[in-house]
Amino acid sequence: MDVKGHSRIALATIALAFAGAAAAFAAAPGNPKPVKEVGGLWFDKDGAPTYNITKDGTVDWGTFVGYLRYNSICLDCHGPDGSGSSYAPDLTQALQQLSYSQFIADVAGGIKSVNTAQDLVMPSFATNKNVMCFIGEIYSYLRARSTGALGRGRPAKSAPDPKGFDEASYKCLGIPM
């Protein structure tokens, strides 16, 4: 995929994040079967990012990038492999109910759930390009974990990075080439 394509995906993803009210009522994720690949990221029939793991265990590039980004940004609160912590939920369980649009709304808008039993707060990541430029990849990784298609730990094998991925990533992040 060329730089424009990746940038369009990132902008569309950010735009979806602000559709918050409608996103709250979206259906849970459906069949994760991959049907289309764009720039290393696979999508299901509904257009949500998904994983493509081959019989020999090779993980698609987007899911592998999602693993790397998750571990650099989300792990501190949500624990290794999305398994949760004493103060942040298990995302492998949450993604069994969260659609892609709900996931984006939660990540971009943050979450605040305060009651007599708990005080949970997740900040907004809407302006964090290290998150929003790779939100589809992070979702794909967590989706693979939530369905049991991908085990714990670093994937042993990954597909090669697709042509133009680095350039598109740098552009989204605002890094000159």
Model-derived regions: residue spans:
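His/Cys-centered metal/cofactor-coordination and adjacent catalytic loops
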Residues: 27-62, 75, 79-94
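Bacterial N-terminal signal peptides
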Residues: 12-20
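Gly/Gly-Pro-rich "capping" loops immediately C-terminal to redox-active cysteine motifs
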Residues: 63, 79-109, 124-128
